[in-house]
């Protein structure tokens, strides 16, 4: 028998049941089945992290969504009432279905008396008044629905669905509370897989990948916003399918299903291995294969006269611009260092690019159109292509004028 000064030992065990693998708490000699418990690894680290901004990242099936929901729920029933409330976003409304299903599975089991309202908004309301709204945020224009709100808990599910960080950063201005008890809890949380339209900006923001063998990534304390203000600290936390005992007990072959569903090598490596070093975020991800589409460089002066060379232009001034040079094969082959190019008429090669940026994300060179034009001609002369390059497509913004009459 323990003495009064000896703390009661509490342990967690997982046992098979008709409902699947379920958690059991052993408090001293008393065992009690519980509705939900954080699993070892990413889930526990995520729920214990007190930084104002945290990303749960990992491969498919790693239990990130459950952790996101419980991150909000763990502060319900603590006496804050309606002051503690949150907003969980998916990119589109249909994508909310999976979140709704998971909340309907867990919340009524854990919180007796909780109510779900499915009207103009999808809202879970706790008996003490706390509430979580499920919504979608497709475009920056949707921010007008939330501008001026105080929302102490904000979640983004599948963050790489957003092509850039605009929507994510807009909501940071709403992550606050006038109640000092709740203000100290205010936080922004997100989940993500590698791959998707937003792969690159999410990778940059959270400095992914996390070093192998680590669960918690670098705590980022040296990041500044566009105005030069120091941002709040943030980090990423790694989740892995191998940690999800519940899913693997119910579906031991789940990983094989993920492998079979992947449409290309990049998607496969992202979903199976959580590989952030893949090429992702573009229109052609589903068909892009580096072994096929990347070839060794060749001297541009060796391009046969029968090939057609032109250039494309994606305009930017305060934002980056891109000039692309293309060579289309006539069917006459080009042979260089044992490699044969252009054997098929119509083969298209991106032979060069001038990307006009400062080296800072999304920051252009602020060059006027005439300076860009001179830069194009200078480069063509350096490459030995003067007089060979035909004009090609350019986006319509080249005709826009600012107040001074200059192209913007």
Model-derived features with residue positions:
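Pre-P-loop entry segment of helicase/translocase ATPase cores
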Residues: 1-53
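Walker A/P-loop NTP-binding motif
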Residues: 65-81
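ATPase catalytic-site recognition across NTP-hydrolyzing enzymes
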Residues: 243-315
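Mg2+-dependent endonuclease catalytic cores in nucleic-acid-processing enzymes, primarily RNase H-like
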Residues: 335-408
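Conserved RecA-like ASCE P-loop NTPase motor core of nucleic-acid helicases/translocases
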Residues: 84-95
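Inter-Walker segment of RecA-like/P-loop motor cores
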Residues: 95-152
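Walker B catalytic acidic pair
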Residues: 157-159
